[in-house]
Amino acid sequence: MTGLYYEQFDIGMEFKHSLTRTVTESDNLLFCALTHNPQPLHLDEEFCKGTEYGQRIVNSLFTLGLVIGVSVGDTTLGTTLGNLGMTDTRFANPVFHEDTIRSVTKVREKRESKSRPNAGLVIFEHYGFNQRDEEVAFCVRTAFMMKTPL
């Protein structure tokens, strides 16, 4: 499926994305390497044995990127002009290696662009859940969306 245009989004619309992903150790290691993040909570098994989790946790920005990325095919693929910002980000529970993440997206609000007659702003709520239905990530994202071409 391709993304939707501005006019196709309705406030309250909800997407339960069918694409899921089981997060691997390699995902976490590669993300940490690519972002130059040496945090021992993500990389050092021995260090993590002494934490409240007892094991490594997945980088939260990987988790957020996954939750939003999974939404693209159903919402913004080929129809967005870019992200304008994210707010209210939270990580209620950690993600561990081998957790399976699913995503839900809701349309919170939308409005016409004040500067671009061919575009509008859609504000999404993105939710990520693990296989135990625990929320692992949330954010509010403002997307600059194309209007249907004339």
Residues covered by each model-derived region:
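HotDog/MaoC-like acyl-thioester-processing domains
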Residues: 1-11, 91-100, 104-150
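Hot-dog-fold acyl-thioester-processing enzymes
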Residues: 1-85, 137, 149-150
